[in-house]
Amino acid sequence: MTESPTTSPATGSGAAAPDSDAPPYRYTAALAGRIEGSWQDTWAKLGTFNVPNPVGSLAPTDGTPVPEDKLFVQDMFPYPSGEGLHVGHPLGYIATDVYARYFRMTGRNVLHALGFDAFGLPAEQYAVQTGTHPRTRTEANVVNFRRQLGRLGLGHDSRRSFSTTDVEFYKWTQWIFLQIYNAWFDPAANKARPIAELVAEFDSGARSLDDGRNWSELSAGERADVIDSHRLVYRADSMVNWCPGLGTVLANEEVTADGRSDRGNFPVFRKRLRQWMMRITAYSDRLLDDLDLLDWPEPVKTMQRNWIGRSTGAKALFAATGADGAALDIEVFTTRPDTLFGATYMVLAPEHELVDELVAPAWPDGTDPRWTYGAATPGEAVAAYRRAIASKSDLERQESKAKTGVFLGSYATNPTNGKPVPIFIADYVLAGYGTGAIMAVPGHDQRDWDFAHEFGLPIVEVIAGGDISEGAYAGDGLLVNSGYLDGLDVAAAKEAITARLEAEGRGCARVEFKLRDWLFARQRYWGEPFPIVYDSDGRPHALDEAALPVELPDVPDYSPVLFDPDDADSEPSPPLAKATDWVHVELDLGDGLKPYSRDTNVMPQWAGSSWYELRYTDPHNSERFCAKENEAYWMGPRPAEHGPQDPGGVDLYVGGAEHAVLHLLYARFWHKVLYDLGHVSSREPYRRLVNQGYIQAFAYTDSRGSYVPAEEVVERDGRFFYRGPDGEIEVFQEFGKIGKSLKNSISPDEICDDYGADTLRVYEMSMGPLEASRPWATKDVVGAHRFLQRVWRLVVDEQTGETRVVDGAGRDLPTGTLRLLHRTIAGVSEDYAGLRNNTAVAKLIEYTNHLTKEHRDAVPRAAVEPLVLMLAPLAPHMAEELWLRLGHTTSLAHGPFPVADPAYLVEDTVEYPVQVNGKVRGRVTVAADADRDTLEAAALADEKVLAFLAGAQPRKVIVVPGRLVNLVV
């Protein structure tokens, strides 16, 4: 138990805020503020929410073992913006605090802490504008966030808080990067292994090179190239999303559907650049299959499944001849190999690596003008087309109804029938999916049909059952016009043609994924530096772990070189390149002192959040990112509790669904690599996920659509008015996400000032289910405040400040109070455990109203103390204060939470509706164990029922036990 002060510094001898109309000891905002500040100081001083670890600096100093019954609760940590919190931000934080407080009161060892995701573009942009170092701005924002969050009374272990920008934190982000860099994925073992083991296998001859070369005959540079090609982190000349307006490349997930940057709304262009990539695709199957092990919302699982996008089909090779006469194979992946005989043309992504080799020097005789893009030569047409589609996002390219493309002037050979098929490029084919090339079967794929119709290409039916003159037929049927496949159904045809392709060496069965490798570099300043240097030949070398952390240097200018947002031909120039003294170093990497250059990119903002849950378990460890014992205790699998397939992970993770295919996917990938390498015992980072809804607020626009300050709008007769500089005008109400842009932001500080933090907590939890979005209405906050005032009055005399309870045993309570008490305990316990805080509030209000009505003079201690304990997770400051006033000398933060007596949950009596010919005409109350005869007699004796019977005798009496009595006349 945590000791409490014997008298409250907040209210020991003080009264409520001065108000001539209010009783001196009424629970007001001023009194709430003093109570809340006092208890927050007490909790901090006593370390009330500090939780022990099995080992390390946070382990019990007396050697006491940690409790077996643990609970790890985590919020998605905030980005500390300059605007601070609005009332929408605390929704999830309060919900998890209620959850953690409840289970802490039941005796569980609860870890609940909050850090800050502090790297990112906003702080960098502010630094560019003001010349202030991003760290200065970020640290000031963190201080303000901690102040605002502190006012809410969140029961966090503050010793475990950190920012991703802390050098002590990002040292381990860099360390994990090195673990991934120095690993490779072994398909046979379906797991990552240390790269040293791959080298050992090549050295011993246990593994051969795929290209047939002899490992022992390779030069050191050639061996390094082979090893680098296997690493889970690698450099590649890849098509990337280049944003000149931001001066950096973006991940696919950071580009909007209309081909613009998610931040800043700048145009984004597809461009080939050499970038760091993470081989997340190696984990596609495991990332997909292990979703079944997780207690996550099904929509989030569906989003991840769709993003990973597993497809089963076949690879087929189409022979072609390059412009220089060289023989080429164009590889396609198709989920419909049964339709190969219907392939009448091919389409490559404009970025496909073979396009330039396949472009003919001139148009073949008789080329359809529709195929030429209005250009004199295929080369000119390809260049013009690439420029035209450079700023289109993948989604735009796939969803565009207008089909465009360019003929390359060359042909490939259909491997099934030997017929030549023209080769096009078109924007609806993406380089990032499959092989970046498709066989076009217009008879049975609508996009191919549309393209063929637009360009006058042949359409062949190979599956009977539809009218391909009107559109593609995608249904089942028997194969036609397909040689040896004729007469087979689709399934049999797939199997037969795949076998034939394999036998002829022109294809094989294949599984493909939509998921692409993770672009893991940004041309920014405010991010984690890479622990990588380059030698004079430009070859990358990983730094030794002893060289970590690689700290960010100060630079005179924090901005990347920004370009005209429409300049697609511009090239990245990172700000770290300006720190020449930092970039150019002399190091001994095992072969003597040599000059090297540091990598001038930084990691994406997702890096720190990909592992931060692990650091909460051991935040001060300077030797490891976390001790294995601490990770195993807080996150290890618990099959006895969660089932034999339990992957482990955080017990409850709460945050927004918008991170489904970003943070959550990246975190799962990093965690699986760490698991494979033996660094963690849990297979997944988050066992259970809950997505909280959003708090929305009314916003108001004038006749031009411009937003006006919501707090200055008044309502009259259902219409809304705003008094601006030109007088009062009518404005129009709409719902919107709370924020600065809609001028409807409301600070939690305002609500705490006007009502107190406990009122804010109760109000937000009472607004509806956690997962649902809900409208904010400041005028409704007073309802939560009045509820807390009623609870206060049950214990404290508003005139004298004295406690107004009477002692007595619980069994002496009136039966109605006793039954309602235990029903409330049972219901509230279930609600807290199920994150149904809104219904818990409703039950507490019902019980409070009952006590207020039935015990006007003084409330029995046995009735009110359980109420105070039940209220504690929701309104902890008031509950602590009332608990102290009730004579207790220990904090209730660690319980005990009341336990319902099952004997009082069984009703003595049951009310039955009585129907006459199926319509309810009366109600009777009988003993819960009443038999059929007793029920029938009671129904026939009811005055209202007798009036409807009017002397008639029922022909039949139907009794449904526990539900109703029906008299048929």
Swiss-Prot record:
EC number assigned by the record: 6.1.1.4
Disordered, as annotated region: 1-23
Keyword 4Fe-4S: no
UniProt: ATP binding residues: 740
Compartment(s) of residence: Cytoplasm
InterPro entries: aa-tRNA-synth_I_CS (IPR001412), Leu-tRNA-ligase (IPR002302), Leu_tRNA-synth_edit (IPR025709), M/V/L/I-tRNA-synth_anticd-bd (IPR013155), Methionyl/Leucyl_tRNA_Synth (IPR015413), Rossmann-like_a/b/a_fold (IPR014729), tRNAsynth_Ia_anticodon-bd (IPR009080), Val/Leu/Ile-tRNA-synth_edit (IPR009008)
UniProtKB keywords: Aminoacyl-tRNA synthetase, ATP-binding, Cytoplasm, Ligase, Nucleotide-binding, Protein biosynthesis
Primary location group: cytoplasm
Catalytic activity from the UniProt record: tRNA(Leu) + L-leucine + ATP = L-leucyl-tRNA(Leu) + AMP + diphosphate
Any GO BP: leucyl-tRNA aminoacylation
Span of the annotated motif 'KMSKS' region: 737-741
Pfam families listed in its UniProt record: Anticodon_1, tRNA-synt_1_2, tRNA-synt_1g
Gene Ontology molecular function: aminoacyl-tRNA deacylase activity; ATP binding; leucine-tRNA ligase activity
Short sequence motif named 'HIGH' region, residue ranges: 78-89
Lineage: superkingdom: Bacteria
PANTHER family: LEUCINE--TRNA LIGASE, MITOCHONDRIAL (PTHR43740:SF2), LEUCYL-TRNA SYNTHETASE (PTHR43740)
Similarity section: Belongs to the class-I aminoacyl-tRNA synthetase family.
Name this protein carries in UniProt: Leucine--tRNA ligase
Underlying gene: leuS
